[in-house]
Amino acid sequence: MAPSQKALLVLVLSMLLTASDSWARRIDCKVFVFAPICRGVAAKRGGDSLSVGGSAELDDALTDPFLRSEEPREWRELTRLSRVLQTFLSHPTGETEQHD
């Protein structure tokens, strides 16, 4: 594979990863009912969330460990894809692994 093809592949994959909506951190309000985004009338109406102020940082500190433990399926797939691509790009052209 030519260097320009590798660069194009890396560019396309990086654009796909950065444009993906799955990267956005979402909170399930059924699970985290006291999260700042899930509080009040604005959250119940589904409109734009209101800024909660000083307690938002404290609430995020409490919910972040739970959010990290529930890694989305898309994130795992993208991580696996990036490992495969790193392995593919690290081998010189024409070199393949041989299994005995």
Curated annotation (Swiss-Prot):
Disulfide bonds join C29-C38. Expressed by the venom duct. Residues 44-100 form a propeptide. Its main location: secreted. The keyword Disulfide bond applies. One of its GO terms (molecular function) is toxin activity. Residues 1-24 form the signal peptide. It is found in: Secreted. One of its GO terms (cellular component) is extracellular region. The keyword Nucleotide-binding does not apply. It comes from the Eukaryota. Keywords: Cleavage on pair of basic residues, Disulfide bond, Neurotoxin, Secreted, Signal, Toxin. Monomer. The cysteine framework is C-C. Belongs to the elevenin family. Negative results: has no effect on six different human nAChR subtypes including alpha-1-beta-1-epsilon-delta-epsilon/CHRNA1-CHRNB1-CHRND-CHRNE, alpha-3-beta-2/CHRNA3-CHRNB2, alpha-3-beta-4/CHRNA3-CHRNB4, alpha-4-beta-2/CHRNA4-CHRNB2, alpha-7/CHRNA7 and alpha-9-alpha-10/CHRNA9-CHRNA10, when tested at 1 uM. May mimic the function of prey elevenin neuropeptide. In vivo, intracranial injection in mice induces hyperactivity (tested at 5 and 10 nM). This is Elevenin-Vc1.
